[in-house]
Design a protein with these regions (language model features):
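Peripheral, non-transmembrane regulatory/ligand-interaction domains of membrane transport proteins
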Residues: 1-185, 189
Length: 191
């Protein structure tokens, strides 16, 4: 695929280790040839596991290239919405903004689930006396939820940086800037 992209679009796609090993401050940059590079984390969560996956985006010549290790729910949801809603996305920047917006929605849903589970733990603790074993189970559950909450917050911070970068490089049109500001407000509402 890399060779095909190079031949078809004159673009050199980064290797996987180049995508993952960047410092936070080096995740957003513009090449001399006009390519815009963005590395953004996307959260993936199942009942069994949760993790972030770094995705590399390159905007070049009216196209958006993305590199990721695996399929993500946010990409599937974007494709579903684009098929069902004409003009949901009009250009490559809309696609990128919508992916970032969907990631915020996805994160908000997970945060809501965290608070629901923490509420159940609170009711257990406040509702009756507990044995040491039961208290240990509750404490362990709280620690798991707080760990998940911290990773979601870090993911949202990364999304905020990506949107801010897109707005700062003045690449977006007025409507897209409005969408970017709305994404930032949505992130702020989760703090």
């Amino acid at each position: 695929e890399r060779e095909w992209a190079k031949n078809q679009f004159s673009i050199v796609l980064p290797e996987e280790d180049e995508v993952d090993d960047l410092e936070a401050s080096a995740r957003f940059f513009e090449e001399e040839n006009g390519e815009l590079h963005i590395r953004s984390d996307f959260f993936q969560h199942t009942d069994e596991d949760s993790d972030t996956m770094r995705v590399a985006f390159i905007l070049k010549g009216g196209m958006l290239f993305s590199l990721r290790r695996d399929e993500l729910a946010q990409f599937r949801l974007l494709r579903l919405r684009a098929r069902r809603q004409p003009y949901y996305v009009r250009d490559e920047k809309d696609v990128l903004l919508q992916l970032l917006d969907i990631d915020v929605e996805y994160s908000a849903d997970i945060i809501e689930g965290i608070y629901d589970r923490l509420d159940k733990f609170s009711k257990q603790v406040l509702g009756s006396e507990m044995s040491d074993d039961a208290a240990g189970i509750v404490l362990s559950g709280i620690a798991v939820e707080e760990d998940l909450n911290g990773r979601i917050r870090r993911n949202l911070m990364d999304t905020r940086r990506a949107v801010s970068f897109l707005m700062r490089v003045k690449l977006l049109n007025e409507q897209q800037n409005d969408e970017g500001r709305q994404i930032l407000r949505d992130i702020d509402s989760l703090d």
